[in-house]
């Protein structure tokens, strides 16, 4: 499978970013925002060779004159016309023609059946792929960490899931979805920075706040104590230079922002916190496998990149379980891309080659084939 010509393509379509590349590589070759922008007024961009849609970085750069849409919300595709993203991925980013390569796509846990069929249909009918497969994101993250059993706390820009997996199979009845994710944290940080007197409201400033969040935020092991420390000393303060050269100082906001993960009530959300969701998910599983799940809590997704999150998670879950139970939280260093890396590993296994859905099988059975072969 080392031959570049028939190397499978692995494409992880996230709410915030699309990550794409070739199976066997250790990192995705293309990572760009999952945004599709359409001109607000036709004819504004005179002489620019008007395009009807801009994707990814180009849409980001021209955002002043475009209406930006995220075709994927909360991890689930809701605008199929805007899945232009795929076209862009194959032709502009990877520079391959999809009819020459098998394609491995990822999907959110609990993805509606109609969505899986639609993905399958587009791949075979629009792109004429020779073969394709749809894998669940959390399972791929677990593979990337070298395990087949564990519970994955997968959290991205738009949605979080806790997914228990036993011997490579998800346990659907115990999957929990949290609509608490990166975007909510960016909103919260915008709000608490406003309290400090920095007005950041536009969509361009929102990107700045997201950058502040990614560079400076961290999770406190003991929130109350950290607040005391922040009041009495300036040890938590950091400065951040804005694009216009203005320097702002950020103190307790650094850990008040991700604290929402552990106390959603801070932003008025009634959802369970990440550690409660993980615990609830495990409690829905068979009593015999709980020990294996507590010992393999794997964090995945860009939203889990905050320093200190693994220790805090471990502390919070430990406080909920019997003292004899050993809790281990694993935070792989490259967890931002672990879904993609897991896909790359899976698609290059020799045993996986009989798992692909081929064009022939699709022609014979129709889109429903995806439920028979991908589970």
UniProtKB/Swiss-Prot annotation:
<dbReference type="Pfam" id="PF00022">
    <property type="entry name" value="Actin"/>
</dbReference>
<dbReference type="InterPro" id="IPR043129">
    <property type="entry name" value="ATPase_NBD"/>
</dbReference>
<comment type="similarity">
    <text>Belongs to the actin family.</text>
</comment>
<comment type="function">
    <text>Essential component of cell cytoskeleton; plays an important role in cytoplasmic streaming, cell shape determination, cell division, organelle movement and extension growth.</text>
</comment>
<dbReference type="GO" id="GO:0016787">
    <property type="term" value="F:hydrolase activity"/>
</dbReference>
<keyword id="KW-0206">Cytoskeleton</keyword>
<dbReference type="InterPro" id="IPR004001">
    <property type="entry name" value="Actin_CS"/>
</dbReference>
<comment type="function">
    <text>Actins are highly conserved proteins that are involved in various types of cell motility and are ubiquitously expressed in all eukaryotic cells.</text>
</comment>
<dbReference type="GO" id="GO:0005524">
    <property type="term" value="F:ATP binding"/>
</dbReference>
<keyword id="KW-0378">Hydrolase</keyword>
<keyword id="KW-0963">Cytoplasm</keyword>
<dbReference type="InterPro" id="IPR020902">
    <property type="entry name" value="Actin/actin-like_CS"/>
</dbReference>
<dbReference type="InterPro" id="IPR004000">
    <property type="entry name" value="Actin"/>
</dbReference>
<dbReference type="GO" id="GO:0005737">
    <property type="term" value="C:cytoplasm"/>
</dbReference>
<keyword id="KW-0547">Nucleotide-binding</keyword>
<dbReference type="GO" id="GO:0005856">
    <property type="term" value="C:cytoskeleton"/>
</dbReference>
<protein>
    <recommendedName>
        <fullName>Actin-1</fullName>
        <ecNumber>3.6.4.-</ecNumber>
    </recommendedName>
</protein>
<keyword id="KW-0067">ATP-binding</keyword>
């Amino acid at each position: 499978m080392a031959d570049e010509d028939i190397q499978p393509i692995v494409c992880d379509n996230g709410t915030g970013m699309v990550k794409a590349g070739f199976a066997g590589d250790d990192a995705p070759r293309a990572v760009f925002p999952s945004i599709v922008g359409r001109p607000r007024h036709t004819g504004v961009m005179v002489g620019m060779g008007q395009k009807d849609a801009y994707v990814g970085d180009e849409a980001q750069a021209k955002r002043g004159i475009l209406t930006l849409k995220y075709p994927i919300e909360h991890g689930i595709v809701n605008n199929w016309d805007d899945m232009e993203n795929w076209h862009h991925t194959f032709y502009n980013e990877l520079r391959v023609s999809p009819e020459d390569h098998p394609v491995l796509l990822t999907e959110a846990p609990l993805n509606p059946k109609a969505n899986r069929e639609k993905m399958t249909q587009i791949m075979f009918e629009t792109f004429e792929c020779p073969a394709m497969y749809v894998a669940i994101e959390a399972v791929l993250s677990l593979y990337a960490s070298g395990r087949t059993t564990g519970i994955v706390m997968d959290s991205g820009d738009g949605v979080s899931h806790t997914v228990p997996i036993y011997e490579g199979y998800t346990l659907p009845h115990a999957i929990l979805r949290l609509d608490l994710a990166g975007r909510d944290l960016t909103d919260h940080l915008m709000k608490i920075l406003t309290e400090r007197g920095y007005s950041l409201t536009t969509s361009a400033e929102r990107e700045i706040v997201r950058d502040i969040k990614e560079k400076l935020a961290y999770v406190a092991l003991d929130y109350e104590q950290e607040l005391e420390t922040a009041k009495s000393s300036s040890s938590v303060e950091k400065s951040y230079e804005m694009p216009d050269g203005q320097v702002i100082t950020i103190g307790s906001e650094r850990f008040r922002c991700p604290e929402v993960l552990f106390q959603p009530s801070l932003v008025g959300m009634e959802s369970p916190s990440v550690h409660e969701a993980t615990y609830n998910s495990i409690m829905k599983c068979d009593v015999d496998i709980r020990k294996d799940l507590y010992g393999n809590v794997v964090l995945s997704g860009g939203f889990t990149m905050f320093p200190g999150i693994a220790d805090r998670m471990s502390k919070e879950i430990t406080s909920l379980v019997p003292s004899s139970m050993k809790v281990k939280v694993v935070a792989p260093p490259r967890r931002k891309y672990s879904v993609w890396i897991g896909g790359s590993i899976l698609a290059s296994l020799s045993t996986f080659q009989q798992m692909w859905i081929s064009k022939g099988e699709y022609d014979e059975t129709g889109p429903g084939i995806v439920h028979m072969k991908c589970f």
